[in-house]
Amino acid sequence: MMDLFKAIGLGLVVLLPLANPLTTVALFLGLAGNMNSAERNRQSLMASVYVFAIMMVAYYAGQLVMNTFGISIPGLRIAGGLIVAFIGFRMLFPQQKAHESPEAKSKSEELEDEPSANIAFVPLAMPSTAGPGTIAMIISSASTVRHGVDFPGWVILVAPPLIFLAVSVILWGSLRSSGAIMRLVGKGGIEAISRLMGFLLVCMGVQFIINGVLEIIKTYH
């Protein structure tokens, strides 16, 4: 049993800095300003479920999917970096106020007409939480841990779903507490957080691209 707890602890130490639920909370605050409490809670739960599903698929089928479509981890990093940087630029340099933008109006109408429409999958679950770095780490870990001898076989079988569940629960708790943060910071604070998050996302996206390019150079040099 101690081996299981040790494996879960190691997994959380590796994944939490990459997933960074607090970053997702700040992004959520910038995107959910027009949502009521019930809708924010629903988005929080759905984002957590999506994160769990993405991590499970990445661990058990990620390498197969990437091999099937000929996708390399450097390619995954560069594509994810472009997406993150694009989202960051849109948040950092909004052409108009967020609540007056066509995207916001379209999303509001979509949420009214179609309850299943949401921001939980993109960008909260992917790429903010289960982004290219997280997915790449999970896929690379899956290809090595199954051949490792540090833990018993049953621990290697049981630990990954529990680690992903723990990350999802932490994300859900963080997003649920964002309501209190919204009451404290107000609309102006949300705008400031949104712009700050935009800058951070641009930096993250550029770094993902740099890492991908460096891996390509290292591979083919």
Curated annotation (Swiss-Prot):
InterPro entries cross-referenced by the UniProt entry: Multi_antbiot-R_MarC
Periplasmic side: 1-7, 66-68, 140-150, 218-221
Subcellular location: Cell inner membrane
Transmembrane segments: 8-28, 45-65, 69-89, 119-139, 151-171, 197-217
Record topological domains on the Cytoplasmic side: 29-44, 90-118, 172-196
Keywords, in A-Z order: Cell inner membrane, Cell membrane, Membrane, Transmembrane, Transmembrane helix
Topological type in the membrane: Multi-pass membrane protein
Domain of life the protein comes from: Bacteria
Any one GO cellular component localisation term in the record: plasma membrane
NCBIfam families: NAAT family transporter, PRK10995.1
Family under the similarity heading: Belongs to the UPF0056 (MarC) family.
Listed name of the protein: UPF0056 inner membrane protein MarC
Gene name in the database record: marC
